[in-house]
UniProtKB/Swiss-Prot annotation:
It is a peripheral membrane protein. The C-terminus is required for translocation to the plasma membrane. Residues 5-42, 63-85 form a coiled coil. The modification Phosphoserine is found at S133. Residues 238-270 are annotated as: Disordered. Component of the exocyst complex involved in the docking of exocytic vesicles with fusion sites on the plasma membrane. In adipocytes, plays a crucial role in targeting SLC2A4 vesicle to the plasma membrane in response to insulin, perhaps directing the vesicle to the precise site of fusion. It is required for neuron survival and plays an essential role in cortical development. It is found in: Cytoplasm, Cytosol; Cell membrane; Midbody, Midbody ring. This is Exocyst complex component 7. The gene is Exoc7. One of its GO terms (biological process) is protein transmembrane transport. Belongs to the EXO70 family. Residues 1-384 are annotated as: SEC8 and ARHQ binding. GO terms for cellular component: centriolar satellite; cytosol; exocyst; Flemming body; growth cone membrane; plasma membrane.
Length: 697
């Protein structure tokens, strides 16, 4: 049971809460009424706004649509006016551009091309929209005139600014490849930069709009002429320079002229010039410039000319490669890609044909020289052939994409030169063997025969062209001729590819064949001499000359490839001839040789028969000595070392024999006039022998 006080308190608390809740409820009711009122007010406002908006829309939309229609009409009018202006402009193109077209593109190419573009568009418009319009014919004619003017401008620019490359610049360009030190690259500027831009611009327009390829023919004709003239100018430069100074150019000349190359001259082949120098060197070494030398030195005038022509041709070949490379770079900028190869092929034909024709002329001249047995002239083929082979990779690269007939020209020339070179080598060997001249040009003093000097000289030239000469022989499959087995490794790659070792062996065998033929011929020629001693001197001189020449020119190393004992064999031949010569003195020394002398008892008076025998011995010795000295004085042993050796050996023998004879019989009273028989002292005999082989004594 809750106490009354607590229940009363609880009731008051509940009443307070109820009162509080009633107040809250009253507040909520008031708030709801206010909210409803606000909602009604808002709905009323929105309804009013919507009504007004609808009224506004109903009044604005018609105005907007009307404005839009007006704007569309305005745009259509503007477009129509623009189209009319555009169409009308085509009718004015002819009059607007006629003056520019008439005056031509010179000096204002871009403006001219702009006018041509307008004319082109006018032509297209009238063709599409009014093909019967007289305006079409007018703009067509104007376009054709404009195109012709552009073609004329192209020709004019190419003609005016295409210059022949000077020989000096060409020589610098060629020598640049051989320079070891770093130098500025030699650049060929065929056309000035501004002109090149115009030419390129015109060519592109003609290809794109002109639909005309005639300008390509104009291009290759003009450039072909300049290329050909540049090469001919270089050749003429060599001829003029050689006629004025003896050589095409010389860096040793202190005062450089304007036609002097700025770089070092490249190494000249100088085949004939080198031949002359070698011949002089060996003739001086072997002949002391006295006997037998005069008929061995070739005519320098003709050989100088051959030398210049050879050098000129080699330089022209190199110049062609450099110019062709430069021409192709220029052509790539001007000519459309799909026409470049064909145009380039046409461009180089004249210059290439000229080089090939000159090469064939060289082959023809060599063929005639072989018939005349003028083998020194044939030597010009060797440096040219070597250079052509060295240049062939560049040639092939330059001629990529050209016609097969163009590509085959150089290989054809190389084959012709190899064939004629191989024939020259074979004919030379046969000529050495079968040389018919015996008495006609035999040296009366027994000195070196011209055939020997010429043969050695020819072989010496092959040292500089070992690979070329070996390839000549190998290309003609001459291995069987020299009985050299072919190594499968040397022939497996291709029929014309031979190793350098095989070529060296082949050339060595060829040289040995020539030397063998020469030796046989010399033996035959030596029989012309009636005196065996002079025959021996002749063979000695020739064998010694051959050996010394082989040693000095390093031919001996090449010979030793297939003939290891060649040097020893020649020394034995030389010694044999010395011994043969020494036997000629037996008819002198036999008179006073101890084995042929009678024995006299000392102190016993000589009988008349004995005195007469001693007189005959002295007289026979004196007469024989005088006769031999007189005869052999005019003989020649050009090699100083050999001459002194032979003199000394003979002097020792004769002095010893004569000294012993004189010692035995000089004091014997075999005559009342001893000075009549004892004409010479031992020293005098030695002096007489010292004067052998010396025409100046």
């Amino acid at each position: 049971m809750i106490p009354p006080q607590e229940a009363s308190a609880r009731r008051r608390e509940i009443e307070d809460k109820l009162k509080q809740e009633e107040e809250t409820l009253s507040f909520i009711r008031d708030s709801l009424e206010k909210s409803d009122q606000l909602t009604r007010n808002m709905v009323s406002i929105l309804s009013s706004f919507e009504s007004r908006l609808m009224k506004l829309e109903n009044s604005i939309i018609p105005v907007h649509k009307q404005t839009e229609n007006l704007q569309r009409l305005q745009e259509n009018v503007e477009k129509t006016l623009s189209c009319l202006d555009h169409v009308i402009s085509y009718y004015h193109v002819a009059s607007d551009t006629e003056k520019i077209i008439r005056e031509g593109p010179t000096g204002r190419l871009e403006e001219y091309l702009g006018s041509m573009a307008k004319i082109q568009k006018a032509v297209e418009y009238f063709q599409d929209n009014s093909p019967d319009s007289p305006e079409l014919n007018k703009v067509k004619l104007l376009f054709e005139r404009g195109k012709e003017s552009l073609e004329s401008e192209f020709r004019s620019l190419m003609t005016r600014h295409s210059k022949v490359v000077s020989p000096v610049l060409l020589l610098d360009l060629i020598s640049a490849d051989d320079e070891l030190e770093v130098q500025e690259d030699v650049v060929l500027e065929h056309l000035p930069e501004s002109v090149l831009r115009d030419v390129v611009r015109i060519s592109r327009w003609l290809v794109e709009y002109g639909r005309n390829q005639d300008f390509m023919n104009v291009y290759y004709q003009i450039r072909s002429s300049q290329l050909d003239r540049s090469i001919k100018g270089l050749k003429e430069h060599f001829r003029k320079s050689s006629s004025s100074s003896g050589v095409p150019y010389s860096p040793a000349i202190p005062n450089k002229r304007k036609d002097t190359p700025t770089k070092k001259p490249i190494k000249r082949p100088g085949t004939i010039r080198k031949a002359q120098n070698l011949l002089k060197q060996y003739s001086q070494h072997g002949l002391d410039g006295k006997k037998g030398g005069s008929n061995l030195i070739p005519l320098e005038g003709r050989d100088d000319m051959l030398d210049v022509e050879t050098d000129a041709y080699i330089h022209c070949v190199s110049a062609f490669v450099k110019l062709a490379q430069s021409e192709y770079r220029l052509l790539m900028e001007i000519i459309p890609e799909h026409h470049q190869k064909k145009t380039f092929d046409s461009l180089i034909q004249d210059a290439l044909d000229g080089l090939m024709l000159e090469g064939e002329n060289i082959v023809s001249a060599a063929r005639k020289a072989i018939i005349r047995h003028d083998f020194s002239t044939v030597l010009t083929v060797f440096p040219i052939l070597r250079h052509l082979k060295q240049t062939k990779p560049e040639f092939d690269q330059v001629l990529q994409g050209t016609a097969a007939s163009t590509k085959n020209k150089l290989p054809g020339l190389i084959t012709s030169m190899e064939t004629i070179g191989a024939k020259a080598l074979e004919d030379f060997a046969d000529n050495i063997k079968n040389d018919p001249d015996k008495e006609y040009n035999m040296p009366k003093d027994g000195t070196v025969h011209e055939l020997t000097s010429n043969a050695i000289l020819f072989l010496q030239q092959l040292l500089d062209f070992q690979e070329t000469a070996g390839a000549m022989l190998a290309s003609q499959v001459l291995g069987d001729t020299y009985n050299i087995p072919l190594d499968p490794r040397e022939t497996s790659s291709s029929a014309t590819s031979y190793s350098s070792e095989f070529s060296k062996r082949l050339l060595s065998t060829y040289i040995c064949k020539v030397l063998g033929n020469l030796q046989l011929n010399l033996l035959s020629k030596s029989k012309v001499y009636e005196d065996p001693a002079l025959s021996a001197i002749f063979l000695h001189n020739n064998y010694n000359y051959i050996l010394k020449s082989l040693e000095k020119s390093e031919l001996i190393q090449l010979v030793a490839v297939t003939q290891k004992t060649a040097e020893r064999s020649y020394r034995e031949h030389i010694e044999q001839q010395i011994q043969t010569y020494q036997r000629s003195w037996l008819k002198v020394t036999d008179y006073i040789a101890e084995k042929n002398l009678p024995v006299f008892q000392p102190g016993v008076k000589l009988r008349d028969k004995e005195r007469q025998m001693i007189k005959e011995r002295f007289k026979g010795f004196n007469d024989g000595l005088e006769e031999l000295c007189k005869i052999q004085k005019v003989w020649a042993i050009p090699d100083t070392e050999q001459r002194d050796k032979i003199r000394q050996a003979q002097k020792d023998i004769v002095k010893e024999t004569y000294g012993a004879f004189l010692h035995r019989y000089g004091s014997v009273p075999f005559t009342k006039n001893p000075e009549k028989y004892i004409k010479y002292r031992v020293e005098q005999v030695g002096d007489m022998i010292d004067r052998l082989f010396d025409t100046s004594a």
